[in-house]
Amino acid sequence: MNNIWWQTKGQGNVHLVLLHGWGLNAEVWRCIDEELSSHFTLHLVDLPGFGRSRGFGALSLADMAEAVLRQAPDKAIWLGWSLGGLVASQIALTHPERVQALVTVASSPCFSARDEWPGIKPDVLAGFQQQLSDDFQRTVERFLALQTMGTETARQDARALKKTVLALPMPEVDVLNGGLEILKTVDLRLPLQNVSMPFLRLYGYLDGLVPRKVVPMLDKLWPHSESYIFAKAAHAPFISHPVEFHHLLVALKQRV
């Protein structure tokens, strides 16, 4: 069986599982893991095929969620950033008894633009898939630059993301393509109407991948959830605004 890379740290009485985004790995959380591990028992995970979780091919969202769940604590707050938000959401839908609270960060239940739904144009995602075969590293770097564009700390935030990618071997092209396929095709807008655990959605006002227009739309669709927008953040608010991010999670802990 292929193994998911998993690291546990901290002594908190609540478990917090952190799931990273497309093309990256768990090293992306190093900017906040020390602070969080003083409040939570923290679980850092490389998604299947990414980082140190080698030996996986492209997986569907459901298979990715099941692979991650195999090593997870019985009950935890599940936090997913970007693509990781879809994985955390899938776990909340299929195994709600394992999820104390769901937190999505700069994530959308439907990343791809649809009729009357803002998102990434499908041809942009298809273009990334094509370019992966042509110039793998440059395509990943372009995607990372998109994630920090517009913020006051854009350059240093992009450097932090690039350092995370380069710290470990690059994922296989089919794994990256599989991740883009999930972003292109998955739509969890209606299923997530039915989750009953605390549900916190965090966004960056300047995010170029998850338009802020989706926030009021999802407030209406999911009235049981809460949303918060980081006024000066883009797609990686935990890198640009770590203190604010940390406070929101500690406040959530008091409620679960």
UniProtKB/Swiss-Prot annotation:
Its main location: cytoplasm. Gene3D superfamilies: alpha/beta hydrolase (3.40.50.1820). One of its GO terms (biological process) is biotin biosynthetic process. Pathway: Cofactor biosynthesis; biotin biosynthesis. Residues 15-242 form the AB hydrolase-1 domain. Pfam families: Abhydrolase_1. It catalyses: 6-carboxyhexanoyl-[ACP] methyl ester + H2O = 6-carboxyhexanoyl-[ACP] + methanol + H(+). It is found in: Cytoplasm. Substrate binds at residues 22, 82-83, 143-147, 235. GO terms for cellular component: cytoplasm. Keywords: Biotin biosynthesis, Cytoplasm, Hydrolase, Serine esterase. Its EC number is 3.1.1.85. It comes from the Bacteria. The physiological role of BioH is to remove the methyl group introduced by BioC when the pimeloyl moiety is complete. It allows to synthesize pimeloyl-ACP via the fatty acid synthetic pathway through the hydrolysis of the ester bonds of pimeloyl-ACP esters. Belongs to the AB hydrolase superfamily. Carboxylesterase BioH family. Monomer. This is Pimeloyl-[acyl-carrier protein] methyl ester esterase.
